[in-house]
């Protein structure tokens, strides 16, 4: 069975919790229900697919149909399951909010691991014609917080209905300094996927707001990548700038460091605030923040970072 709601409030479907409405909301449980709805109902376009709603900011009422599958498995539950089985590859993804489907679309990642490192293939339904097909890891064309599912021609059209995983790691992924410190603290001989997962979760909990207490969309900005020449200019003024050299020679600079050094940790606009413990996150501090509050704070952050560092920040959160 499916449920179709008209002109409804969907703030509860997002982790930000700012006011949000849509012309239609379609909720269903299995693929047969979805097929029935697509055949029987006249659904206003455009279409928007929501997983766990953890990477969205509704800036105005959505005039189309929001698709929301009920009972989606959370990414963290999958991480816990694999870690309990002693399988390496998911431990660094522990604690990331949202569904496995949304995480794949976004190529969610943390501490040196991304969804591209664990996804084998995905099953997809084309909402335009009902066709079903399979995309391999390569077909997904994963990039930094990006995938083939986010392209203008596929977003809102291709719906992931199932995912299979094939983690490739044979041990802990230690490209991130924090993970290396975790392995050192517990000892290589005691390093199990579950032990690392618990440390990763504790680290996240120490810096990030609890989703059931404070609304947010997780990391609000992408970590900018700049050229070696631009990074040399940055080092002239800020020799302590943290950085990560990418495979193509570009330099990734942590957005959290830029925001912090711009003096914006804890900054507020209306009910929106830069999270004091992790400036990469914007939170609904009062529980009554509006999209206008968040956008005003976003503009302020972008302007001040650009002025101080000559670096343009790009939001990671999808603006609707």
Regions found by a protein language model. Give the residues of each.
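Anion-binding (especially nucleotide phosphate/pyrophosphate-binding) glycine-rich loop
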Residues: 1-128
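Phosphate/pyrophosphate-binding loops and the adjoining catalytic core of nucleotide-dependent enzymes
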Residues: 301
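Phosphate/pyrophosphate- and phosphate-bearing ligand-binding catalytic cores of soluble enzymes
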Residues: 5-7, 11-18, 56, 132-296, ...
């Amino acid at each position: 069975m499916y449920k179709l709601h008209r002109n409804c409030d969907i703030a509860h479907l997002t982790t930000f919790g700012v006011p949000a409405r849509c012309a239609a909301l379609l909720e269903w449980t299995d693929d047969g229900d979805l097929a029935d709805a697509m055949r029987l109902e006249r659904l206003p376009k455009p279409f928007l697919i929501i997983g766990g709603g953890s990477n969205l900011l509704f800036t105005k009422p959505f005039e189309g149909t929001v698709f929301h599958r009920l009972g989606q498995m959370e990414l963290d539950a999958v991480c816990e399951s694999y870690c309990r089985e002693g399988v390496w590859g998911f431990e660094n993804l522990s604690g990331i909010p949202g569904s496995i489907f949304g995480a794949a679309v976004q190529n969610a990642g943390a501490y040196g691991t991304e969804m591209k490192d664990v996804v084998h293939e995905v099953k997809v339904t084309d909402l335009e014609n009902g066709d079903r097909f399979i995309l391999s890891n390569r077909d997904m064309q994963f990039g930094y917080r990006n995938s083939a599912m986010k392209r203008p021609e596929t977003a809102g059209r291709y719906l992931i209905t199932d995912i299979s995983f094939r983690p490739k790691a044979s041990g802990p992924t230690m490209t991130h300094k924090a993970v290396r410190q975790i392995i050192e603290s517990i000892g290589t001989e005691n390093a199990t996927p579950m032990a690392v997962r618990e440390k990763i979760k504790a680290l996240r909990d120490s810096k990030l707001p609890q989703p059931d207490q404070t609304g947010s969309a997780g990391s609000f900005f992408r970590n900018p990548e700049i050229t070696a020449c631009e990074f040399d200019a940055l080092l002239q003024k800020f020799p302590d700038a943290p950085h990560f050299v990418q495979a193509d020679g570009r330099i990734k600079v942590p957005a959290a460091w830029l925001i912090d050094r711009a003096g914006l940790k804890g900054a507020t606009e209306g009910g929106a605030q830069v999270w004091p413990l992790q400036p990469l996150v914007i939170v609904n501090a009062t529980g009554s923040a509006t999209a206008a509050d968040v956008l005003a704070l976003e503009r302020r952050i972008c302007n001040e970072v650009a002025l101080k560092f000559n670096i343009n920040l790009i939001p990671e959160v999808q603006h609707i």
